[in-house]
């Protein structure tokens, strides 16, 4: 039974909305075309070859000064010249050797040929399209005096008129006696044809007649022609030959019912034709049409969408709901009119129009038959006229740019009405046929995105459709998302979402495929209640794109993003736990991998770059080319720019043996060139290196090398530098010293030898942050070798410690306590630790380091002698030139010339400098010769905290002889103790001077007091030294000066001293340095001991504030001079 009429009272009739004039769209399209043609219009007339040549010459001469370039061309303005440059900017940006005037001429010739060729072809193809636009407007046709059959009872608002000036195809279709079969659409059987359409006339409402008489534009004629075609189609919407009801079209309704039915037919036809596949734009003309007819429909596409389509949607959304049987007849007629094929009974009568969901609760209407088949279909005599009108309308829609809003809304309106009408008619449809139909529906949906029918409230084409679609996908339940990812269905056309158990069944949602966009949630929620009013409690409408869910589902979707967000927060806030088992397993796997020879070999090929080869492999020619052209800063290039770049770079080489051979030859030439630069730098012929060359390795630099025999990677130090090889001392004593090629030596810190051009692209601070341990070890290694003996501290002790040497925890604690209580006592502990660490080294390490120092001293002397030999050779050549000039009779012409004198003086000055270098190298070599005779650190003081038995430090006596005299530790400690006492006495004298008023008398007394105290300290120190000479391995824990010394030291930090503001610690260290220098000059000590004492004195003067570093540098220079002078007096 049909639903009760009480439901219809809910909706009020509203007048049909007025058609919106399409002038705005035409204006926007014209503006868009104007913007597109702007650059070509700015070019002006076609450029000749001479003008292009002059433009290119002027551009290369004046650059981007367009006024000057235009003046150089003479016949062009600055705007035209700039437009030409903008069009060929990518090509003109190339360097002058790559780009040429020939290429510019060729590019412009191609541009004009494509421009003219494209316009000619368009003119030929669209010849029939341009004719109606330029034709004058024809006179309006007044209302017809001959009403057609069946239209007598219509009211005025349902009458239509047409124009004979804009759409001649509609008029022609109704004046021809028989349809003309064209091309492949020749029917296989004879087609019956009716002559009723010749007598059919058009009607026009009085309101529109009055407006047209005043003179409206041609766009209204387009609208009325479409309305007329649809009205005729609705009047003759009888069934096809399949239904065998040819007389159904003669069935008449009352005027009011007939008007409602006609409007519904118009809306249905517009919706179906707007949903036609866009791929059929270029299809052949429909049955009964010619090429000329199809060419006449160029301009009316926007008119349709703004005319009848939008008004139909607005009317449909607010209109009434029709009975099930009547709408069913209408749907059947309209569908068969559009398709007209024999395929309808193959799928079953109910299945070809509707689809049922899997549980049989939700049904949907689907347009099943494609247009490709409909174009080849055959029609009966009763329906061919209506099909002609619909085909004409279809041809018009295919030529129009489909407006998304109107098309979507029209389709949505039709689907909503169809679904409401048929919701209870096909309740028991066969599930098997439904699954078959569903599969067909899914395949069509993927192929034809615009054929889907959807809810008008849910489908709105907007710029933010993609964003809304992403939001809707995020709002899916987590379980659904996991299932989609798990089953790899992200690219499928539907996602099944479970709903609440309120009789709504399953719901299908597309995954953003095709031209449909996601629905807006506001309209989704606003219209959901309205859609439920038109459905029964057991059956619900499920649209193709997205259905209106129940209130429970809406609440669930609203709350879902919050749940997902909270779960994500919990995951991110979970603390990171380090599993020791996984770390150990990873270390084990890594060690197992490194144990493989192939893995190590692969690491060498991947990351090992020698200092000389690194700039070659780090060079990127393509990046250099982009920088040269000026496109290096552009993150993304256009297609035209890529084309110009590819054409300028040429065809890429094939990776072949010949290619590798040529690249190797280039690499060998590069290496020879770099070595030549290095040799010139070493000989003094070159002041510096180019910016793109790596700096050579220096002597004593830490490197990573490939061992020439084992071909494994090992660490080592550079001992000597040769032309193409280095003498490397490996850290492993078993490997010894080997000559290694310069292509197999890599610096431990690549930044030290990196070229200046590449170093600028590196963040030096980031490297230090990422490699703090490596950098610290490298700095220690650089300082470990100084004048042939290693400098050690307590921080590097663990690197050189041996199993037979241990430091007790109590001693470490003692060091902390002493450093916290008295900073001055910390120096003695540090020195004791350093000395003990050195004495506890294995003898092999000392021998290796001694050999390294010997080789270094010898290499420095050899290099100095080579330089001196070159200078002497040059000096000899100059002398020979003077002698030859005198023999030739020039007398002293050459000798008296100013240039010769300057050159000769420069050579002599260079010779004097080289002589100094040779003398220093000889001195270093002599020091190494005496170093082997004496072993430093033969004795050491023991310093411990009283009362702790473990606070003692043992050592092994290294067979020191009595002839060595004072040891380094004795000199350092005695000097520091004496300096502290002197400062303490001086501070006491200053206090006395501040208290008394008679400063002259007190000054003399203070000086006498200080001298007396110093003399007493000297006598005490001599007695202490005598008692220390007979002691064995264990020594007292405190030095022999009086026990009041620590107390005296503690007095230095009293408030009185703070009031005086005397830097007693710094003063005591400076005085200790002077005392050390004095003691080193009194007797001839071994050079190693002298150097060590002076270095310890300089190290003690290192400032805490960075502002004092320049002063400290000057002190170091002065101490170096003093050391050289002292060592020069030492006999070899």
Swiss-Prot record:
Higher taxonomy: Eukaryota, Viridiplantae, Streptophyta, Embryophyta, Tracheophyta
GO biological process: DNA-templated transcription
Gene behind the chain: ALY3
Disulfide feature: none
Biased composition (Basic and acidic residues): 522-535
Originating species: Arabidopsis thaliana
Segments of skewed composition (Polar residues): 236-245, 1018-1035, 1047-1059
Residue ranges of domain SANT in the record: 42-93
Record keyword Nucleus present: yes
Gene3D superfamilies tied to this protein: 1.20.58.1880
Localization per Swiss-Prot or TrEMBL: Nucleus
Protein name: Protein ALWAYS EARLY 3
Stretches with biased composition (Low complexity): 433-442
């Amino acid at each position: 039974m049909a639903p009760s009429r009480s439901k219809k009272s809910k909706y009020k009739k509203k007048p049909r909305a007025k058609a919106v004039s399409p002038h705005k769209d035409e204006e926007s399209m014209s503006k868009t075309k104007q913007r597109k043609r702007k650059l070509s219009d700015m070019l002006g007339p076609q450029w000749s070859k001479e003008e292009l040549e002059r433009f290119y010459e002027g551009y290369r001469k004046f650059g981007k000064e367009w006024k000057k370039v235009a003046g150089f061309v003479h016949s062009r303005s600055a705007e035209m010249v700039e437009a030409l440059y903008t069009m060929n900017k990518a090509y003109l940006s190339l360097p002058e050797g790559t780009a040429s005037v020939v290429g510019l001429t060729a590019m412009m010739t191609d541009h004009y040929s494509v421009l003219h060729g494209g316009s000619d072809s368009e003119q030929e193809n669209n010849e029939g399209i341009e004719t109606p636009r330029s034709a004058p407007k024809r006179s309006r046709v007044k209302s017809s005096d001959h009403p057609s059959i069946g239209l007598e009872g219509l009211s005025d608002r349902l009458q239509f008129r047409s124009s004979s000036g804009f759409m001649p195809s509609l008029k022609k279709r109704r004046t021809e006696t028989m349809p003309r079969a064209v091309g492949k659409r020749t029917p296989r059987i004879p087609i019956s044809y009716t002559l009723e359409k010749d007598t059919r006339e058009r009607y026009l409402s009085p309101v529109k007649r009055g407006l047209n008489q005043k003179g409206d534009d041609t766009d209204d004629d387009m609208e009325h022609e479409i309305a007329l075609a649809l009205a005729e189609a609705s009047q003759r919407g009888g069934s096809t030959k399949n239904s065998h009801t040819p007389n159904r079209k003669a069935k008449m309704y009352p005027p009011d019912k007939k008007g409602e039915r006609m409007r519904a037919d118009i809306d249905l036809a517009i919706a179906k034709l707007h949903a036609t596949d866009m791929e059929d734009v270029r299809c052949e003309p429909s049955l009964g049409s010619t090429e000329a007819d199809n060419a006449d429909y160029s301009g009316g596409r926007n008119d349709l969408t703004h005319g009848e389509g939008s008004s139909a949607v607005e009317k449909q959304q607010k209109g009434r709901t029709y009975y099930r049987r009547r709408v069913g007849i209408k749907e059947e007629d309209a569908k068969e009119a559009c398709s007209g094929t024999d395929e309808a009974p193959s799928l079953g009568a109910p299945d070809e129009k509707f689809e049922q969901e899997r549980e049989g609760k939700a049904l949907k209407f689907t347009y099943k038959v494609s247009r490709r088949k409909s174009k080849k279909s055959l029609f009966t005599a009763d329906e061919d006229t209506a099909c002609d009108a619909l085909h004409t309308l279809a041809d018009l829609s295919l030529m129009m740019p489909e407006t998304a809003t109107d098309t979507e809304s029209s389709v949505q309106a039709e689907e909503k009405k169809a679904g409401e009408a048929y919701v209870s008619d096909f309740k028991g449809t066969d599930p098997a046929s439904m699954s078959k139909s569903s599969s067909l529906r899914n395949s069509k949906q993927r192929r034809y995105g615009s054929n889907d029918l959807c809810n008008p409230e849910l489908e709105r084409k907007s710029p933010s459709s993609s964003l809304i679609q992403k939001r809707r996908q995020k709002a899916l339940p987590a379980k659904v998302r996991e299932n989609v990812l798990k089953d790899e269905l992200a690219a499928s056309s539907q996602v099944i979402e479970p709903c609440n158990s309120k009789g709504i069944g399953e719901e299908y949602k597309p995954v953003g495929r095709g031209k449909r966009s996601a629905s807006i949630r506001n309209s989704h929620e606003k219209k959901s209640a309205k859609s439920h009013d038109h459905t029964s409690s057991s059956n619900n409408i499920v649209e193709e794109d997205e259905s209106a869910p129940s209130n429970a589902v809406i609440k669930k979707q609203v709350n879902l993003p919050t749940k997902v967000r909270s779960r994500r927060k919990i995951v991110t806030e979970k603390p990171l736990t380090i599993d020791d088992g996984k770390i150990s397993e990873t270390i084990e796997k890594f060690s197992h991998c490194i144990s493989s020879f192939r893995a190590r070999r692969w690491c060498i090929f991947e990351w090992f770059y020698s200092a000389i080869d690194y700039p070659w492999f780090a060079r990127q020619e393509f990046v250099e080319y982009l920088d040269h052209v000026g496109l290096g800063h552009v993150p993304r290039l256009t297609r035209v720019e890529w084309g110009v770049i590819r054409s300028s770079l040429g065809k890429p080489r094939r990776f072949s043996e010949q290619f590798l051979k040529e690249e190797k030859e280039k690499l060998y030439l590069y290496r020879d060139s770099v070595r030549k630069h290095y040799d010139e730098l070493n000989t003094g012929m070159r002041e510096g290196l180019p910016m793109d060359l790596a700096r050579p390795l220096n002597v004593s630099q830490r490197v990573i090398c490939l061992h020439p025999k084992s071909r494994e990677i090992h660490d080592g130090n550079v001992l000597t530098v040769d032309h193409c090889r280095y003498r490397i001392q490996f850290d492993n004593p078993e490997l010894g010293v080997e000559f290694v090629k310069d292509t197999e030596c890599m610096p431990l810190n690549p930044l030290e030898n990196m070229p200046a051009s590449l170093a600028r692209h590196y963040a030096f601070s980031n490297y230090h942050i990422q490699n703090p341990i490596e950098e610290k070890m490298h700095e220690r290694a650089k300082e470990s070798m100084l004048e042939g003996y290693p400098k050690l501290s307590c921080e590097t002790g663990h690197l050189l410690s041996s199993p037979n040497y241990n430091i007790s925890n109590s001693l470490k604690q003692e060091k902390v306590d002493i450093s916290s209580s008295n900073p001055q006592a910390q120096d003695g502990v540090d020195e004791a630790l350093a000395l003990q660490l050195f004495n506890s080294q294995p003898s092999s390490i000392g021998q290796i380091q001694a050999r390294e120092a010997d080789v270094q001293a010898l290499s420095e002397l050899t290099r100095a002698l080579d330089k001196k030999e070159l200078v002497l050779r040059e000096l000899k050549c100059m002398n020979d030139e003077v002698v030859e000039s005198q023999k030739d009779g020039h007398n002293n012409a050459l000798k008296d010339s100013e240039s010769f004198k300057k050159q000769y003086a420069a050579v002599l000055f260079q010779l004097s400098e080289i002589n100094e270098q040779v003398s220093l190298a000889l001195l270093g070599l002599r020091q190494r010769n005496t170093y082997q005779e004496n072993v430093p650190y033969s004795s050491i003081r023991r310093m411990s905290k009283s009362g702790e038995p473990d606070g003692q430090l043992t050592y092994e006596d290294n067979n020191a002889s009595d002839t060595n005299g004072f040891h380094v530790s004795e000199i350092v400690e005695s000097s520091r103790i004496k300096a502290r006492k002197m400062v303490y006495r001086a501070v006491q004298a200053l206090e006395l001077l501040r208290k008394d008023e008679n400063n002259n008398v007190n000054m003399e007394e203070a000086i006498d007091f200080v001298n007396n105290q110093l003399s007493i300290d000297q006598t005490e120190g001599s007695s202490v030294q005598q008692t220390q000479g007979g002691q064995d391995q264990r020594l007292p824990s405190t030095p022999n000066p009086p026990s009041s010394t620590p107390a005296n030291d503690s007095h230095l930090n009293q408030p009185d001293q703070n009031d005086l503001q005397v830097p007693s610690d710094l003063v005591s260290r400076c005085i200790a340095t002077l005392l050390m220098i004095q003691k080193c000059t009194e007797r001839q000590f071994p050079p190693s001991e002298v150097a060590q004492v002076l270095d310890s004195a300089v190290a003690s003067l290192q400032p805490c504030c960075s502002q004092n570093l320049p002063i400290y540098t000057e002190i170091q220079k002065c101490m170096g001079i003093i050391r050289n002078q002292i060592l020069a007096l030492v006999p070899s």
